[in-house]
Every structure is written in structure tokens, then in C-alpha cells.
């Protein structure tokens, strides 16, 4: 048998008629039309529940306590570890020099030196905050800190 365009038809069962609901009890889907009795799912627009809604029970996001917050100061301040300063040339160190050396990300608005490791070079910090331990280490290496 040759295949012709006018003989083409979908496979058996590939295209079924849509089920008509609510058209008498003889159909098996009359009266409640497969939606059950009452409740939100039986209604028009039913089943569309807001995220977090738990049926009137106090929702999880209200049952649990609020905890913590993200400090804007911490977000805008970059930490620079003291041993990373050795990547720079000895001398004056300010925020611009730290950014040029890629020690401070572009989103940061200020920097703070934190003590970790040893310092071998003499630095003069200008306009950069430092912890008490970092100040002591810089001064012990012969440098100074100017706020």
C-alpha cells in the first residue's frame, strides 16, 4: 500500500475528545463535576492559595522568631588581612592603593586591616581603619597608622 497525503490520519487514541463535565449523572462526571463537595477546590478559582498560607493556622514565617540582620557597614567594608599588605611596596598605603592591588572588591566603600600573619615591610596607613592587633603589628614593623 502506498502512502498518500489524503490517507494520513492520527494514530488510534492519539486525539481524544475533551471530557464534558457537569452534564448529568449518567456521564459519571455530573453534579459536582469531579470537584468533590464544598471547600475551596470546589469553587471557581479554587486551589489558588497564597504562598505561605496554611489554612488559617498561624503560618511558619509568623511562628518563628526574627533572627539577626545583615549589617550595611559590614557589606560596605572590606577586610584586608595584614599578611596581604606584603604584596604592596613599602610606604604609604591608602584605600586607592589597596583597590589598585586588588585587595579590595569594587563594591567596598572602605577597608579595614585585620591582623593575620607576619608583616615584613614598613607601611604608613592613611585613611584606612585597622584593628588594635594590626596597628600594633604595623608599628612593630616600623610603620605607623594615620586615621
Curated annotation (Swiss-Prot):
Basic and acidic residues composition-biased segments: 1-12
Compositional bias annotation for Basic residues: 34-47
InterPro entries given in the database record: Ribosomal_uL15, Ribosomal_uL15/eL18, Ribosomal_uL15/eL18_sf, Ribosomal_uL15_bac-type, Ribosomal_uL15_CS
Region listing for Disordered, in residue ranges: 1-61
PROSITE patterns tied to this protein: RIBOSOMAL_L15
SUPFAM superfamilies, alphabetized: Ribosomal proteins L15p and L18e (SSF52080)
GO biological process: translation
Record's keyword terms, sorted: Ribonucleoprotein, Ribosomal protein, RNA-binding, rRNA-binding
Record carries keyword Heme: no
GO terms assigned for molecular function: rRNA binding; structural constituent of ribosome
Annotated Gly residues bias: 23-33
Name of one Pfam family that matches: Ribosomal_L27A
GO CC list: cytosolic large ribosomal subunit
Family: Belongs to the universal ribosomal protein uL15 family.
Function comment: Binds to the 23S rRNA.
PANTHER family: 50S RIBOSOMAL PROTEIN L15, LARGE RIBOSOMAL SUBUNIT PROTEIN UL15M
Quaternary structure, from the entry: Part of the 50S ribosomal subunit.
Name this protein carries in UniProt: Large ribosomal subunit protein uL15
Amino acid at each position: 500500500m502506498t502512502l498518500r497525503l489524503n490517507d494520513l490520519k492520527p494514530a488510534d487514541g492519539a486525539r481524544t475528545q475533551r471530557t464534558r463535565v457537569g452534564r448529568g449523572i449518567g456521564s459519571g462526571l455530573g453534579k459536582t463535576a469531579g470537584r468533590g463537595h464544598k471547600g475551596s477546590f470546589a469553587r471557581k478559582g479554587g486551589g489558588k492559595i497564597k504562598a505561605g498560607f496554611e489554612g488559617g493556622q498561624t503560618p511558619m514565617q509568623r511562628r518563628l522568631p526574627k533572627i539577626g540582620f545583615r549589617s550595611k557597614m559590614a557589606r560596605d567594608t572590606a577586610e584586608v588581612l595584614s599578611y596581604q599588605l606584603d604584596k604592596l611596596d613599602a610606604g604609604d598605603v591608602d584605600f586607592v592603593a589597596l583597590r589598585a592591588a586588588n585587595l579590595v572588591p569594587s563594591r567596598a566603600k572602605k577597608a579595614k586591616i585585620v591582623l593575620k600573619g607576619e608583616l615584613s615591610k614598613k607601611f604608613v596607613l592613611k585613611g584606612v581603619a585597622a584593628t588594635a592587633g594590626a596597628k600594633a603589628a604595623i608599628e612593630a614593623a616600623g610603620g605607623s597608622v594615620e586615621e
